[in-house]
């Protein structure tokens, strides 16, 4: 819709192939395929790698995060609605993938930033981190007037759904076990 002339290749399924890949092609794949096919993907020059729903790489020691780090690219960016879910190491992992070295090695980041902020509530460490990452984070909200004006308002509907007989039995067994 926005760039109909740009070729797009779906690299997914059993018949996937990168044969005849042109430099201007956008390649779409899944994290699972990227993890399994990292060597094949790393054999090609990439101008840009974009990780959508990048919470999939927030654990820096996961197989997926490690695999994506082996695929060289001139630039990388990560899209996520939750850059930090549980700990600051989530943020370190995303930024170390997009901008290697920005926050230093993981052990130093933990020692100098994560522990002081998370455990000690150190405002100086928090401000230092905020200053470092501010240029790399873009926070947008659906309420911002320029963000997707054609999106309808959010609608929430509660529906009562009865449990099946099996679900009732499992629920009662769990309650009895816990109580």
Annotate the PLM regions:
Residues 88:
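Conserved AAA+/SF3 P-loop NTPase catalytic/coupling segment centered on the Walker-B
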Residues 5, 73, 175:
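ATP/adenylate-binding site constellation spanning eukaryotic-like Ser/Thr protein kinases
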Residues 42-79:
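SF2 helicase catalytic motif II
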Residues 1-12, 102:
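Conserved helix-turn-beta segment of the N-terminal RecA-like "Helicase ATP-binding" lobe
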Residues 92-104:
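A short helix-turn-beta junction within AAA+ P-loop NTPase domains corresponding to the substrate/partner-engaging
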Residues 28-34, 39-43, 102-179:
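Inter-lobe coupling linker of SF2 helicases/translocases
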Residues 14-48, 59-63:
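Conserved helix/coil segment N-terminal to the catalytic DExD/H
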């Amino acid at each position: 819709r926005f760039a109909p002339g740009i070729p797009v290749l779906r690299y997914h399924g059993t018949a996937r192939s990168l044969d005849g890949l042109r430099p201007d092609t956008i390649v779409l794949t899944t994290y699972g395929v990227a993890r399994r096919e990292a060597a094949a993907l790393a054999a090609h020059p990439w101008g840009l790698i974009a990780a959508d729903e990048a919470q999939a790489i927030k654990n820096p020691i996961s197989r997926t995060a490690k695999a994506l780090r082996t695929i060289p690219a001139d630039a990388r960016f990560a899209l996520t609605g939750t850059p930090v879910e549980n700990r600051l190491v989530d943020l370190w992992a995303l930024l170390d993938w997009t901008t290697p070295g920005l926050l230093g090695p993981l052990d130093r980041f933990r020692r100098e930033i994560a522990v002081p902020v998370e455990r000690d509530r150190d405002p100086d460490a928090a401000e230092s981190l905020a200053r470092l990452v501010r240029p790399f984070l873009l926070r947008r909200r659906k309420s911002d007037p320029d963000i997707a004006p054609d999106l309808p308002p959010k609608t929430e509907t509660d529906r009562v759904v009865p449990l099946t007989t099996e679900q009732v039995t499992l629920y009662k067994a769990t309650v009895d076990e816990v109580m």
